[in-house]
């Protein structure tokens, strides 16, 4: 018999730095899940990623108080800010430009995110990420 799904929990946790403090502890604790078990499993799963990068995770909680989780790739906005060397996007992206990214940097970001993108090919994926960059106030070169 299949386990009954109780709920889905969506969080953004820094890679390799999951601990029982908020947001992980309260989100799992109120559903009766083992917090330390998740922290150890998540940290092991994200050990190959750069420590500190926010990593989206979707936790499936079952009615018997067990869980499974799936990690996604780091959000494009975080990768774009890192590539451009800025701390935040522009408040007025069409008038104030805060940084520059090259096509090569966009292709590297697409390689990181390719599992989560729905684009048909590399060119379409690069255009998608370039649109995100422009909406943050970054200039796309190349």
UniProtKB/Swiss-Prot annotation:
Molecular-function annotations in GO: large ribosomal subunit rRNA binding; structural constituent of ribosome
InterPro entries assigned: Ribosomal_uL11, Ribosomal_uL11_bac-typ, Ribosomal_uL11_C, Ribosomal_uL11_C_sf, Ribosomal_uL11_CS, Ribosomal_uL11_N, Ribosomal_uL11_N_sf
PTM summary: One or more lysine residues are methylated.
GO CC term (a single one): cytosolic large ribosomal subunit
Gene3D superfamilies in the record: Ribosomal protein L11, C-terminal domain (1.10.10.250), Ribosomal protein L11/L12, N-terminal domain (3.30.1550.10)
Subunit and partners: Part of the ribosomal stalk of the 50S ribosomal subunit. Interacts with L10 and the large rRNA to form the base of the stalk. L10 forms an elongated spine to which L12 dimers bind in a sequential fashion forming a multimeric L10(L12)X complex.
Function: Forms part of the ribosomal stalk which helps the ribosome interact with GTP-bound translation factors.
Protein name as it appears in the record: Large ribosomal subunit protein uL11
Organism ancestry: Bacteria, Pseudomonadati, Pseudomonadota, Gammaproteobacteria, Lysobacterales
